[in-house]
Amino acid sequence: SGVAKFAKYPLTFGPSPISNLNRLSQHLGSKVNVYAKREDCNSGLAFGGNKLRKLEYIVPDIVEGDYTHLVSIGGRQSNQTRMVAALAAKLGKKCVLIQEDWVPIPEAEKDVYNRVGNIELSRIMGADVRVIEDGFDIGMRKSFANALQELEDAGHKPYPIPAGCSEHKYGGLGFVGFADEVINQEVELGIKFDKIVVCCVTGSTTAGILAGMAQYGRQDDVIAIDASFTSEKTKEQTLRIANNTAKLIGVEHEFKDFTLDTRFAYPCYGVPNEGTIEAIRTCAEQEGVLTDPVYEGKSMQGLIALIKEDYFKPGANVLYVHLGGAPALSAYSSFFPTKTA
């Protein structure tokens, strides 16, 4: 694979496992065979998740440059910032996290939302958590630049890790490795996955998978489900990162488009719709697999809808990419009242 030439610092247990979600498949009429690639349990660092795979290719740069602080940014319940806090602890670096107000949470619930879930874990791991009132944007942020400047002015050497690692030059490399794993695991399992379904917001996960699968001429197997609700921006950023990553790994393919299903991101980033809640419950009740209301709940909602619509050919093997995110669930407790037995 073209990613082999890049330095990598191991943060995961190795290739993430693939589970057969056979009860979910049966529940949906046995039309297709659903499998999940479990990025949600890929590491012993603070519950793991997809960002660690990206960070593995960024750490060599951090270690080499002798940086003092890791600085990252996300919403209040960002998984990215939790992972950067864990990484900082692992590397013995200080950590500053900018947690912006990306999600319109009702005032009555804001206090809980700002204290539990991912943000709580980051605080436990010793990060300097800065809660800022700016709204959602997948691009580069003023608050982020300010934090970096402040640390530099104080004589420190901060390392910037942008939202979702996406604007980092190596942000897409981790999921090239993911694509290589899928190809190897197909051989081990004796099956071929017809389609790969993945959540998309800041773009580098999907971009890495696209570039990685393009090594095997299978980039069209990827179906991304938008959870940003700013899908044009997400598509543009994903294509840019995919093309940049393809160049890095020596793949002669120019991405001009990819499948991005935009039907499930409403009402906005970070707020589940009724279908999202239903999908989270369905997956949990059928499989004991937990998905979150921000990312995976929406991609699971998309997967279930596509199966019900007969989007996939009968008997298809569909690989759902579980990117993590469950630590945010406690911040959304009001969406999940007790069901009577």
Curated annotation (Swiss-Prot):
The active site is at 78 (nucleophile). The keyword Transmembrane helix does not apply. It catalyses: 1-aminocyclopropane-1-carboxylate + H2O = 2-oxobutanoate + NH4(+). InterPro entries: ACCD_DCysDesulf (IPR027278), ACP_carboxylate_deaminase (IPR005965), TrpB-like_PALP (IPR001926), TrpB-like_PALP_sf (IPR036052). The keyword Amino-acid biosynthesis does not apply. The modification N6-(pyridoxal phosphate)lysine is found at residue 51. Its cofactor is pyridoxal 5'-phosphate. GO terms for biological process: amine catabolic process. The modification N-acetylserine is found at residue 1. Pfam families: PALP. Transmembrane segments: none annotated. GO terms for molecular function: 1-aminocyclopropane-1-carboxylate deaminase activity; D-cysteine desulfhydrase activity; pyridoxal phosphate binding. Keywords: Acetylation, Hydrolase, Pyridoxal phosphate. Its EC number is 3.5.99.7. It is an enzyme of class 3 (hydrolase). Homodimer. Belongs to the ACC deaminase/D-cysteine desulfhydrase family. Catalyzes a cyclopropane ring-opening reaction, the irreversible conversion of 1-aminocyclopropane-1-carboxylate (ACC) to ammonia and alpha-ketobutyrate. This is 1-aminocyclopropane-1-carboxylate deaminase. It comes from Cyberlindnera saturnus (Yeast). The lineage of its organism: Eukaryota, Fungi, Dikarya, Ascomycota, Saccharomycotina.
